[in-house]
Regions:
Chain B
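Strongly charged, low-complexity linkers/loops
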Residues: 357-368, 372, 381-450
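Extended, charged alpha-helical coiled-coil/arm scaffolds that mediate oligomerization and mechanical coupling
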Residues: 377-378
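Basic, nucleic-acid-interacting segments
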Residues: 1-291, 302, 308, 329-333
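Amphipathic alpha-helical core segments of compact helical bundles
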Residues: 195, 226, 321, 342-350, ...
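Hydrophobic face of alpha-helices
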Residues: 8, 56, 164, 218, ...
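Core structural elements
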Residues: 184-196, 301-325, 334-352, 362, ...
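Short, amphipathic C-terminal "tail helix"
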Residues: 438-470
Length: 485, 470
C-alpha cells in the first residue's frame, strides 16, 4: 500500500484528524527545512483551512475524494492564486498570480492539502537546484549532496517526508533526475497528458508536469487525478485509456523490456550495474530483455539545448519589470529600465540560456541551429517509434551518476549539461518515463533507473515499475527526516 | 527621365469577432483602460493561448473574397520583439505557413493587384502618454487581425486609393470588419520604390508605416515618390528604411534604417497546434459568403443596363446593393429602381455612414410596387418621383398617394387611341418628322400628354408614336 492510501484510510478510520496530520507536517517542515531548504514558501493558513474542511467532511460521513486530505507541495513554477510563485528567481520575487494553474485547480477541488511551494533551479534551468535565488535544496540522504534539479525542492521534501507527494515539472529530466538523486519515484508523463496551463514556461514544447512520490502506487494515483483534459491548453489531450491504477499489478510475463546499448555508454559503473541487476530481476519475473541500438540518441543533448534555449529566450522575454515582479530602482527611460531589470533580476544560468536561445534563432543562424535541431528532433522521435515496434518499454539509467556534492555542478556548465544525457531524449520525443530507485552506491546515495514507454503508455510503465517495487522493496528507503506514519 | 512608381501594401484589418484571438475577453472598441483584459491577454506567466475558431473562419472568408487559396495546414509563429505594449514580448502571428496564399484585388480598370498571402495575428496594446508618464492599456492586446500582403503591383497613386477602397468594400461586404481607418481597425504600411520607366529591375524600397487615412496614404506616396526621384536625379541613392509620415508637415521621416531593423527571431509557437482546414470546411464557409461587389457590379451593368457610374454607387455598400436586388426581383427595367435609389434616396442619405447603413423608411417591396406601376404605364415618372419623396418621409406604400383615379384609364389601349388621335390631328408635324425633322414629333407628344392629364409615360408614348408613323 502506498502512503496516499494509508493516510486516507487513517483519516477515514479516525486514527488521526486531517488538521492533526497537517500540523504534524507543518511542524516537520519547521524542523527540517533549515537544512533541506526544500520549501521556499510555506502556506499553513491554506493547509489548515483545507484540512478543516476535510475533517468536517469526514464527520459528515462522506467518502474522501482521491488525494483528499493528503499533504503535498507544488514546485514554485506552478501558479497558485494569491500565493507567491517565483520560479526561484529574483525577477519574480513577490509575484502572486491572480489565477490557478489547472493542476492546482484540480488538486484544490479534491482537497489535497497544500503545505507550500518548493525550491527549484531558477526557471527550471539547472540540474542541481543550486541556481535557485534561495540557494539549493539538499539531499535528504546526505545534506552535503544536492537534491538534483530542477525540481529539487519537491524531491527533497518528498524524500525527506515533509510532504506526501509533490508536483514537479520536467523539461529535460527535472522530475526524474531529482527523484533518482533522492531515492524516490518521479513520473514524467507523455507530452500533452497533463495540462501545462499555469506552469510558468521554460521550454513550452518540452515542459510537462508530473508527480514525485515515494512509491509507484502514489505516482499512479496522483497521475490519474491530474491527467485531465484541459481546453485552455491546446496541446493537452489528457490521459488516454483506463486509470493507470487499475493495471498496476498486471502480470509482466512475456513482456519485452528493451535496453538501448547507447544508454549504458558513459554511465558510471555502479549505476550501470544497478540497472543491469534490475534487468535480471525482470527476467526472473518472466520478462524478456532485448538489447538494441538507438544511434539517434547522440543528437539528443545538442538538440535539447538548442530547442529549450530558443523557446526559453522567447518565453522569458516578458519579464521586463512593467507589469509584475522585480523592477530596478534607478533608471533613465524605458530601455534602460528593461535592461537593468533583466540584468539584475535573472541569474547567470538563465542569462546564459537566454543568450544561447537568442543566438540560435537570429537571422543567419536559424537554419544552421534551430531548423536543424527541429529536423533532428524528428529523427529522434522516429527512432523511438521504431524501437517501440519491437519492445514494450525501455529500461535505462535515469542519470549517469548519483547525486553530486553541493557546489560541484556549478563549476562547469557543459559538464553539468552532460548529466541530462539520459533524460532529455524522452522530452524531445514527448514520451512518458518513470524513474524508480534501483539501489545505492557504496556511500549510500540512491541510484535511479527509468522505465520509458510509448506515447500515453503511462499505465504500462507504471505497471512495470510497480512490479519492480514489489520485488525489491529494499531499494525504497526512508531517511531520518520528517513524519513517520 | 520618367520614373515609374512601384508600390505594395501591407494592410492590417481588425476582425469584428466578439472575443479576442486567444482568450474570451471582449474586443469592443474603447472601454476603461485594461478593462477588457485577463491573465491570458496580459501575458501572465504560465498562461496559454487558445485559438478562437471564428478568427480562422473570418480569415478564410477574407481569403476567399480575394480569390486566394486556403491552406489546408497553417501554423502560428512567434514574432519576438520587446515593447511595453506587447505583454508577452512576442506577437503570435504567421510567417512560415499563413492561412491563405495568393489571390488578387481587381480594380475597375480590370487590372489585378496580386496578393502574396493573408495571415492571422494578434494586435498589441496601446501606450498612453499623460502628465509626463507613460501608461499601457492592453484592451487592444489580443484583438484579432488579418494582414493582407500585396505584391508590388501598384503603379499609380490612384491605383493605391482604389486598392484600399476595394479592400475596405470587400471586407465590409463579407462582414469581417468595419475597416474604419480613423479608429484604427484598418491600417496600412506602404512599400515604395521608383525605377526608370521601362526598367524591369526593382529599385530600393522604403516602407511608410501605419497610415490611418486614404488621403494620408495618397499624400505620403506622392511625397515619397517625389523624394526618391529627386534623390536619384541628383545622384543620390535611396536607402532601405522604415519611414513615418507626418500629415501636419506632409513629409516622411526615418524611424529606423535597415542596419537597425528588428530581428524578430520568428519560430513556430509551441503552445498552439497546427490549424487544419478541410476542403469541405472551406466550401461550407464559401457558401455563406454574399455575392461580392465586383460580381454584382458586372451583373448590374451587363444584365440590367445600369450605367457604370450608377452601378458603382449601388455596389459600394452591401446594404444598398441588397436593397436594390430585393427591389428589382420581377422588374423588366431594373434601371428605374436604380434611378430612384441614386436620385431620391441618396438625397436623404448624405453622409457615407448614412449610405452604408442605408436605413430608409421605404421597403424594397414598396419601391418595387411603385416601379411596377411605371412599367405598367399606370404612373408617369414625375408623379412617381414626388410620390417616392412622400413615401420616404412616411414609410407608407405608394397606394397611399396615388389614387385609383390617377391610375385609371391609362391602360395601353387608351394610350394607343390617344396616339392615333395625335397623329391625325397633326398631319403637318408628321410630314416634317418623316422628312427627318426629329423635333417635329413633339407636337404629337404634347397632344397625348395633355389629353392624358400628364399621366402617360412620355418614353412609351414617344416610342408608340414613332412606330405608328413608320
Ligand atoms: Zn483576455
Amino acid at each position: 500500500m502506498g502512503y496516499i492510501e494509508k493516510i486516507q484510510s487513517m483519516l477515514q478510520n479516525g486514527e488521526i484528524s486531517c488538521v492533526e496530520l497537517t500540523e504534524k507536517y507543518l511542524k516537520a517542515i519547521e524542523e527540517a527545512n533549515g537544512e533541506l531548504n526544500a520549501y521556499v514558501t510555506v502556506t499553513p493558513e491554506v493547509a489548515l483551512e483545507q484540512a478543516k474542511q476535510v475533517d468536517e467532511k469526514i464527520k459528515r460521513g462522506e467518502k474522501l475524494l482521491p488525494l483528499e486530505g493528503v499533504p503535498m507541495t507544488l514546485k514554485d513554477n506552478i501558479s497558485t492564486n494569491g500565493i507567491e510563485t517565483t520560479c526561484c528567481s529574483k525577477i519574480l520575487k513577490g509575484y502572486k498570480p491572480i489565477y490557478d494553474a489547472k493542476v492546482w485547480a484540480i488538486l484544490k477541488k479534491n482537497n489535497a492539502i497544500l503545505l507550500g511551494k518548493t525550491n527549484m533551479d531558477e526557471f527550471a534551468m539547472g540540474s542541481s537546484c543550486e541556481t535557485s535565488c534561495f540557494g539549493g535544496a539538499t539531499n535528504p540522504f546526505n545534506t552535503d549532496h544536492v537534491a538534483g534539479g530542477s525540481s529539487g525542492g519537491v524531491a527533497s521534501a518528498v524524500g525527506g517526508d515533509i510532504a506526501v507527494f509533490g508536483l514537479g515539472s520536467d523539461t529535460g529530466g527535472s522530475i526524474r533526475q531529482p527523484a533518482s538523486f533522492c531515492g524516490i519515484v518521479g513520473l514524467k508523463p507523455t507530452y500533452g497528458a497533463v495540462s501545462r496551463y499555469g506552469l510558468v514556461a521554460y521550454a513550452s514544447s518540452l515542459d510537462q508536469i508530473g508527480p514525485i512520490t515515494k512509491t509507484v502506487e502514489d505516482a499512479s494515483l496522483v497521475y490519474d487525478v491530474i491527467s485531465e483534459y484541459d481546453e485552455n491548453d491546446s496541446t493537452c489531450e489528457g490521459r488516454q485509456g483506463e486509470p493507470t491504477y487499475d493495471t498496476l499489478n498486471n502480470d509482466i510475463k512475456g513482456m519485452k523490456i528493451g535496453i538501448a546499448r547507447e544508454y549504458l555508454e558513459g554511465v558510471r559503473e555502479d549505476v550501470k550495474e544497478a540497472v543491469l541487476e534490475a534487468a535480471r530481476k525482470y527476467e526472473e519475473m518472466g520478462a524478456e530483455i532485448v538489447y538494441f541500438d538507438l544511434p539517434a540518441l547522440k543528437f539528443a543533448l545538442p538538440v535539447y539545448y538548442i530547442l529549450a534555449c530558443a523557446e526559453a529566450s522567447s518565453n522569458l522575454g516578458r519579464y521586463d519589470g512593467i507589469r509584475y515582479g522585480y523592477k530596478t530602482e534607478h533608471y533613465e527611460g524605458i530601455h534602460d529600465m528593461i535592461c537593468k531589470t533583466r540584468s539584475e533580476g535573472f541569474g547567470e544560468e538563465v542569462k546564459r540560456r537566454i543568450l544561447l536561445g537568442t543566438y540560435v534563432l537570429s537571422a543567419g543562424y536559424y537554419d544552421a541551429y534551430y531548423k536543424k535541431a527541429q529536423n533532428l528532433r524528428g529523427t529522434i522521435i522516429k527512432a523511438f517509434d521504431d524501437a517501440f515496434k519491437n519492445v514494450d518499454v525501455i529500461l535505462a539509467p535515469t542519470v549517469p551518476m548519483t547525486a553530486f556534492k553541493s557546489g560541484e555542478a556549478t563549476s562547469d556548465p557543459v559538464e553539468t549539461y552532460l548529466t541530462d544525457i539520459c533524460t532529455v531524449p524522452i522530452n524531445i520525443a514527448g514520451l512518458p518515463s518513470v524513474s524508480v530507485p534501483c539501489g545505492f552506491n557504496k556511500n549510500g546515495m540512491p541510484i535511479g533507473m527509468q522505465i520509458i514507454g510509448d506515447k500515453f503508455k503511462e499505465g504500462k510503465i507504471l505497471n512495470v515499475a510497480y512490479k519492480y517495487e514489489q520485488a525489491c522493496p529494499e531499494n525504497f528507503k526512508d531517511t531520518k527526516w520528517g513524519v513517520k506514519l | 527621365m520618367k520614373y515609374e512608381l512601384v508600390a505594395g501594401f501591407e494592410t492590417h484589418i481588425e476582425l469584428a469577432t466578439d472575443t479576442k484571438i486567444f482568450c474570451s475577453c471582449s474586443t469592443a472598441f474603447g472601454g476603461a483602460p485594461n478593462s477588457h483584459c485577463c491573465p491570458v491577454c496580459i501575458g501572465l506567466p504560465g498562461t496559454l493561448p487558445k485559438l478562437n475558431k471564428k478568427v480562422v473562419e473570418y480569415g478564410i472568408k477574407a481569403g476567399l473574397a480575394t480569390h486566394g487559396k486556403i491552406a489546408n495546414i497553417s501554423k502560428m509563429d512567434r514574432k519576438n520583439y520587446c515593447y511595453p505594449d506587447l505583454s508577452k514580448a512576442y506577437q503570435i502571428s504567421q510567417l512560415y505557413a499563413p492561412l491563405t496564399i495568393g489571390g488578387y484585388v481587381e480594380l475597375s480598370s480590370g487590372k489585378k493587384i496580386r496578393l502574396h498571402h493573408i495571415h492571422i495575428e494578434e494586435d498589441a496594446g496601446k501606450l498612453i502618454h499623460s502628465h509626463g508618464d507613460t501608461y499601457v492599456d492592453y484592451n487592444r492586446g489580443g484583438v484579432p487581425l488579418i494582414e493582407i500582403v500585396s505584391e508590388p503591383d501598384i503603379r499609380y497613386i490612384d491605383e493605391a486609393r482604389e486598392y484600399v477602397e476595394k479592400l475596405q468594400q470587400v471586407m465590409r461586404y463579407i462582414g469581417i470588419s468595419d475597416c474604419r481607418m480613423q479608429e484604427g481597425s484598418m491600417r496600412c504600411d506602404v512599400n515604395i520604390s521608383v525605377r526608370p520607366e521601362g526598367s524591369e529591375k526593382l529599385g530600393t524600397r522604403t516602407e511608410i508605416k501605419n497610415m490611418n487615412s486614404i488621403s494620408n496614404i495618397m499624400k505620403a506616396m506622392e511625397y515619397e515618390y517625389e523624394r526618391q526621384v529627386d534623390l536619384i536625379e541628383n545622384g543620390g541613392k535611396v536607402v532601405q528604411e522604415t519611414l513615418r509620415y507626418d500629415d501636419a508637415t506632409n513629409t516622411t521621416s526615418s524611424m529606423r534604417s535597415k542596419e537597425d531593423a528588428h530581428d524578430y527571431r520568428y519560430f513556430r509557437d509551441p503552445d498552439l497546434v497546427t490549424i487544419c482546414v478541410t476542403d469541405e470546411e472551406v466550401e461550407e464557409i464559401k457558401s455563406t459568403l454574399p455575392e461580392l461587389p465586383t460580381e454584382k457590379y458586372k451583373r448590374y451593368v451587363s444584365e440590367y443596363g445600369v450605367p457604370e457610374k450608377d452601378a458603382q454607387l449601388l455596389t459600394k455598400y452591401r446594404n444598398i446593393s441588397e436593397y436594390f436586388d430585393k427591389a428589382i426581383t420581377d422588374l423588366k427595367k431594373p434601371k428605374t429602381a436604380s434611378n430612384f435609389i441614386i436620385g431620391q434616396m441618396f438625397r436623404i442619405l448624405q453622409t457615407e455612414e448614412d449610405k452604408e447603413a442605408f436605413d430608409v423608411k421605404t421597403t424594397p417591396e414598396q419601391l418595387n410596387e411603385l416601379c411596377k406601376l411605371i412599367e405598367g404605364g399606370k404612373v408617369q415618372n414625375n408623379l412617381a418621383k414626388s410620390t417616392l419623396d412622400k413615401m420616404l418621409e412616411s414609410g407608407k406604400p405608394c397606394t397611399e398617394y396615388i389614387s385609383e383615379e390617377d391610375m385609371a384609364g391609362l391602360d395601353d389601349s387608351f394610350v394607343d387611341d390617344l396616339c392615333r388621335q395625335a397623329i391625325e390631328a397633326n398631319p403637318k408635324a408628321v410630314e416634317q418628322y418623316k422628312q427627318g425633322k426629329e423635333k417635329a414629333i413633339m407636337a404629337c407628344m404634347g397632344y397625348v400628354m395633355k389629353n392624358s392629364k400628364g399621366k402617360a409615360n412620355a418614353q412609351d408614348v414617344l416610342e408608340k408614336i414613332k412606330s405608328m408613323i413608320s
